Every structure is written in structure tokens, then in C-alpha cells.
Amino acid sequence: MKLALSQRGEASSDAQRRQLNCDAQRRGPPGGLRINARALVAALFSALLGTIGSAAQAQPFETPPLPAPPRSLAIATPTEQRLPNGLRVVLAARPGVRLVTAQLLVLAGAEVDPPQRAGLASLAAGLLTKGTQGRSASAQAREAESLGGSLDSSAGWNQSQVSITVTVGQLNPALGLLADAVMRPTFAQAELERLRAQVLDGLKIAYSQPATLATLATERLLFGSRPYGHPADGTPASLPRITRTDLQALHRAHYRPDNAVLLLAGDLDDAGALRLAARHFGAWRGPQTGAATASRLALAALPTPAPAAGSSASPAAAAAAAAAPTPWLAIDMAKSDQATVMVAVPLPPLGADRATASVLNAVLGSDFSSRLNQEIRIQRGLSYGVGSQLDARRDGGALRVSVQTRNASAAEVVALVRTELDGLIDTPVPAAELAARKAALVGAFGRSIETTAGLGSALRSLVVAGVPVSELRARIEALSAVTADAVQRFAAAYLGAGARRVVVAGEALEFSASLQAQAPAQTPLSSPSRRFVTLTPATLDIERDGAWPDR
């Protein structure tokens, strides 16, 4: 045992020494002074509060400054020129920003997909960056990267496009890449098979989701067998049918200068834009036939355009809104954890009412403060994903409400959406709410065109819709001029109960009975029991008319 010498000169063990130390700690410091730890902490805290209070008295509270007055947004008027071969050259100049976004648009998209070839336009656009007569796919990517950009291609309903954003000094070679991709694609069989396999793999996952099936079904109920009614990305049945010959035929018919637009946004002037366009696209020639025209939708079944602000709603539109309703559709997805609710109405080409439709959509459901989000998410907690979308296509579009919710609450959500739509028809939007929504739209538009890519996107929307590019400058004024009366008249013309398509995808056992109880009593079908139709994913043939209820 280890020994230590005690104060009395006696040996002590380690244990005895530790006991002496403990006794000394309990006795406290010499002289009998005892320190209470809790009291010490309290004293220090009080002193700190006193210091803070003194500082607060020394520096009185200051009212934060008011928001600065709104600043007008300076937007140069876009200009349009044309090459001898018919190519339109549109420029949105942004002096001082040493970037340029270039887009080559072909005014043909998924609407020109032939019967039984859904997804053809999408595949064709995707393959534009997968090899040309002079460059492999990897060479295209390497050259774009060497210029500091990325060569991207895609197709929408009304257009196919290739785009790139580079510095001004790299625009010349970048336009060479764009021209090569659009004019000389090879549609190599190996690349076709690779892209087709990727899309099919994606569809396998997508088709297992309620949101995907609800969206596809809604499109079909909105547009029927007309071009907008088919899946733009294709289906598991249509994609395997598409051949390289199909791709080449579509390219010959629609990829031509008299059906194309070169959009440039950035630090460039008109003369420079036209010179570069002529250098890279001047030799482009289309077939020696009449200009290709994208297949147009037969709009007889859609309501006529809404009146401009200041006039009364047209009788034809009001009559269409009161027409017999389309059957409601439930898609039974057994064991689905949640349901997707979609309520949609068809819209004609909007024309002068684009701003009114945008404001109505903002009030209804386009942001966090909108009515749908306030009622369904914040007040009732029925969804984390609720909103509305305005889809303004060239030949008519739609307003869609989409909600992700529990299966058991799907019917309740449908009723809430119907109530909000009715509210827009029955009651003018209060002035404060209207002003807030318009301010949000104006601010969002200003932010969206801060970059050359955003400016180019706004310009593309106008060109594809067939709206004069000069309307870009008038966007803010048009939004600011929308009145509550105009919103209410638009709602009355297009949001009526007879125009609504209702689709719910999920575990139908949990919502079908309560949903069917809401379905309108009138029906355009011979059998009233067909006002509510339930399908399963296996029977939901989105290419075959006979599988669908009459519209």
C-alpha cells in the first residue's frame, strides 16, 4: 500500500488522504467564508440584466423604415426581323449583361404526334443533342462545356426547342452548335433505343403514382381524343412503336426555317443578331412545299374567349358553363397511401384575358397565401400539396386544381375546391386581397426576367402563344389593370359546375361512396348511373377512346 505523511507526521493511506480533502471542501475556505453557488449565479444574472436594461435605456427603440416606393421595371421592347428563308429572329436586348441566352424554337410540339405515336415529338427533341452528322453526342456536350454552357433540348405541346446560355464572346460558336443540332440530327438507332429505355423506365415509376394517373385522366377528360388529350411523353404502348423513320419524317415536315424562331436575350443589338442568324441559319432550307402547320384543335366544344375587361360575359360562354357536366372519374389504386384530387376546367386561347386569368389563378391557388392553401392546408390541415395552375396553350388550355391528401379526406377536399370555385363566381374579390395578389404577380414577373434565361423564357411564352412580342413590356400594366369585376366575369364564364372535370386517384374504397354522393345529378349519358365512373390502372387505357366515358 502506498503511504503518505499526514499533517501530524503520521503515515496515511490514499483513502485517508482523499477523506481529508473531502472534509476540507465541506468546511470551505479558511476563515469560515462559504460560497453558495446558486446565489452566485443569481447575482451574476441580475447584474447582466441590469447591464442590458441600461443599454436599452441608452438606445431607445427605433421604428424600422417603411418600404421604399415601387420602382418601374425598365424593359426594352423586343424586336423582330426575318431572314429570306423565313426564319424569324427575335431579340430582347439587355445591354451591360455580358451573357446571351439563345433558343431555337420549332413551332411544333406534342400536338403533332400522329395517332398511336404519342411521345414522338418529345423523343425527336430529346435526340437533337444526341448526335449530328458532324458531331457525336459526346462531342456536342464537350463543345458546349468548353463554351461555358450546356446544350439543352426539349418539347412542349406547341414547340420543340434547343437552347444554350453563354457569354457574348462565345455566342458565335454556340449558335453553330444550335444550328447543327436542329438542322442535321442523325437520330441514331442506338441513341433512340437508349432514350426510349430511359423514358419507359421513368413511366414505370410515374404510373405507380396517383398524381400521374390523375393528371393523364384529367387531360383526357378535358380534351378527349383531340391532340392535347394524349400523353405528351408517350405511353408504354406507343413508345415501342416509334421508329427512326418516324423521327425523320417528323423532322422533315416541321423542322424548317419558315416554322422556326431564333430567340436571343442579352447584350446584343439588332444588326449583330441578324448577322449571326444569317451566318448560321441562312443556308437552312425546308421542303419545297407549303409551310408546315401544326395540327389545330377543334375548339367547337370549348367556350368562346372571355370578354375583355369592361364588357359583359358572352352568352355563348355562359351557356357553355351551364352545359351538362362530364362524368366524375375515380381511379382505384389499391393500397395507395394517399389520394390525388384534380378539378379542372377547359379554357380557350386567352388572348386579351391572359392577365385576368393570371390574377384569378393567383387568388385561387398559385401561392402560399391563396384561398385554396389557406382553406385546405392552413385551416384544416388536409394537405401539404395544394395549388392551382393556369395552363395557357396556343389552341386552348385549362385551369387545374391539384391536391395531395389522405384517401379518407379526398371527398371533403373535392367539396372544398368546389366551394372556392363557386366563391369566385358569386362574390367579387375584396380590394385588399386583389391588390396583394396583383402585387405578388408583378413582383414575381420582375424577378423572373432578371436573368437572360428568364427573359428568354418569358419571350418564348409569347412567341409560342402567337402573342406579339411587344406585349412583354405591357405585362405589368396589364396585371395592374385587372379589376375584381373582370375576375368575377371570367370565373362566371369558365368555372361553372358544368365545365368542371373531377378526377380522384387513390384507394377508392375509402372515398368512392362520399364522392359519388357529390356527383352532379345531370349527365350527358343515357344512364344516370354513369355520372360517376371508377376505373383501375389496368383498365385506364389512355390511348383508346372506348375505355373512356363519353365527354
Residue ranges and their predicted role:
Residues 45, 59, 82, 139-292, ...:
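Charge-rich, well-structured scaffold segments of protease-associated domains
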Residues 105, 290-369, 538-551:
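His/Glu-based metal-binding/catalytic segments typifying zinc-dependent metallopeptidases
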Residues 101-165, 230-231, 367-382:
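M16/MPP (pitrilysin/insulinase) zinc-metallopeptidase core fold and M16-derived inactive scaffolds
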Residues 71-103:
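Mature N-terminal segment immediately following signal peptide/propeptide cleavage
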